[in-house]
Amino acid sequence: LKEIYPDIPVVIGGIEASLRRVTHYDYWQDSLKPSILVDSGADWLCYGMGERTMIEFTKAIEAGRNPSDIRKIPQLGFYMDGKCRLKDAVILNSYERCCKDKVAFAENFHVVETYANMLQPPVLVEPVGKGYVQINPTWPPATQEEMDSFWDLPYTKLPHPRYKGKHIPAFEMIKFSVNTHRGCFGGCNFCTIAAHQGKFIQSRSEESIIREITALNKLPGFAGNISDVGAPTANMYGMKGKDPELCAKCRRKSCLFPGPCRNMDRSHERLLKLYERIAKVKGIRHAYIGSGIRYDLFLDEKGFVDDTSYPYLKELILEHT
């Protein structure tokens, strides 16, 4: 594409590019690969959930803004020749060093994961070849109004037209599912959700979710059964820290391990109210919870953690399985 249209900026994004934004292990070739920006030749990389980044980026392109201004847009990555001159950037181990030293690679992974879970992360820079890859900080967590605006767009909920007439097993599993929020503060070592969505929960309003569920009735083949009302972790909807200032200083990747954070509000009240409203939507026979559940959000060694814990577990077992 760049050979045909060398002056057209190429932007890559999505979870595949997002998780390859710095040095990473490639299973197929059993080797460490540099940032996907280097191998792909793309000009820009939008990582994480990219609505705000792409809106800002397209506005900047349309307005003819200076590339130096574009390089300040949050959640954008790019490759530059030479050495980084930013004084406040965190410099990672180079790609070449990571290839020679597995400890250096582990250090990079730890740094990237730590800052992916912070509200105010710095710029990350990874030297590679004769230049460097710069990864800008994330946006602040999306507000409820922003989350609603993302989901209230007129999506068809259908596969790309190129797959017309073909059976797609993955689509069958999710075509009648509904997403309630983004992010996960579980911090499981095997999971990369936080590297893509962050650990801070960003929830939609009940009204937005109910609008989507009501619209399911118009989809061909819908028989009243929702396969999943969930997210990375289904029962984190509406949860957040009691004191935002403490969250802003936090460097923990998990709010639950090795023990639940005392600043975390684990009430399931909002989720119970949402389930109650879903049950009243005309045409809905059953709303399953297909996403994962964190039992340590409502149970500990002493039993149920608050007065919403038992009602939630009862509702989950009797109505959503």
Predicted regions and their residues:
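Conserved, mostly hydrophobic/aromatic
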Residues: 43, 150, 184, 188, ...
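C-terminal, active-site-flanking charged/polar segments
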Residues: 36-38, 61, 76-77, 205-226
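Acidic/polar loop patches that form or flank catalytic/metal-binding clefts of enzymes
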Residues: 47, 67-72, 158-162, 199-203, ...
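N-terminal pre-triad scaffold of radical SAM enzymes
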Residues: 166-192, 223-225
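Glycine-rich beta-alpha loop elements in corrinoid/cobalamin-binding modules
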Residues: 1-129, 135-140
